[in-house]
Amino acid sequence: MKVLSSLKSAKSRHKDCQIVKRKGRVFVICKTNPRFKAVQGKKKK
């Protein structure tokens, strides 16, 4: 999983990529091609 400062290009890498917010972080998940996974932001305390 890559840690990126901007997810704009990450979400458009594959047509099945989705953006999900979990615990203060923004994730790009792609079930058909998991190498496109990415995350942005730090975990909230």
UniProtKB/Swiss-Prot annotation:
<dbReference type="InterPro" id="IPR047621">
    <property type="entry name" value="Ribosomal_L36_bact"/>
</dbReference>
<dbReference type="GO" id="GO:1990904">
    <property type="term" value="C:ribonucleoprotein complex"/>
</dbReference>
<keyword id="KW-0687">Ribonucleoprotein</keyword>
<comment type="similarity">
    <text>Belongs to the bacterial ribosomal protein bL36 family.</text>
</comment>
<protein>
    <recommendedName>
        <fullName>Large ribosomal subunit protein bL36</fullName>
    </recommendedName>
</protein>
<dbReference type="GO" id="GO:0005840">
    <property type="term" value="C:ribosome"/>
</dbReference>
<dbReference type="InterPro" id="IPR035977">
    <property type="entry name" value="Ribosomal_bL36_sp"/>
</dbReference>
<keyword id="KW-0689">Ribosomal protein</keyword>
<dbReference type="Pfam" id="PF00444">
    <property type="entry name" value="Ribosomal_L36"/>
</dbReference>
<dbReference type="InterPro" id="IPR000473">
    <property type="entry name" value="Ribosomal_bL36"/>
</dbReference>
<dbReference type="GO" id="GO:0003735">
    <property type="term" value="F:structural constituent of ribosome"/>
</dbReference>
<dbReference type="GO" id="GO:0006412">
    <property type="term" value="P:translation"/>
</dbReference>
